Amino acid sequence: MATNEALAEYLALHHKGEANAVTSRELECSFQMRGSELRREINALRGDGIPICSFEGGYCYAATAEELERTIRQLRSRIKKIAFAERGLSSALPDYVDTGQLSLPLDGGDAP
């Protein structure tokens, strides 16, 4: 059984609903993976339609539509914040584009 399948089954059987959420640290220890690997696995499962929710208390398999909707709202909020940061960085990019021209200070110019 692949790690993500085992993870989905484990959450569905033992951690259904927010009241039964499991911490990231517990999952990392149980499945012997780093936090970044766990997040990647959770994201892949969600992408496959597996209803895994996250709360302050950790991760759980959704027990209700409300739990799932809350996680969806949380993800959408993060998407908006990431998109805002991306737009800001993209607007700064022209300042870093190499025009291929060499710039030399001139005598009496604005060189220190």
Question: Predicted regions: what is each one?
Answer:
Residues 1-10, 112:
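Short alpha-helical segments that sit at the start of domains
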Residues 13-19, 48-50:
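Short helix-capping/hinge SLiMs at alpha-helix to coil transitions
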Residues 23-30:
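A short acidic, leucine-rich amphipathic alpha-helix
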Residues 32-44:
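Short amphipathic alpha-helical interaction segments
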Residues 46-56:
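A short, conserved structural fragment
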Residues 55-64:
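Minor-groove-contacting beta-hairpin "wing" of winged helix-turn-helix DNA-binding domains
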Residues 67-90:
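Short, amphipathic alpha-helical interaction segments positioned at domain boundaries
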Residues 89-112:
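Exposed, interaction-prone assembly regions rather than primary DNA-binding/catalytic cores
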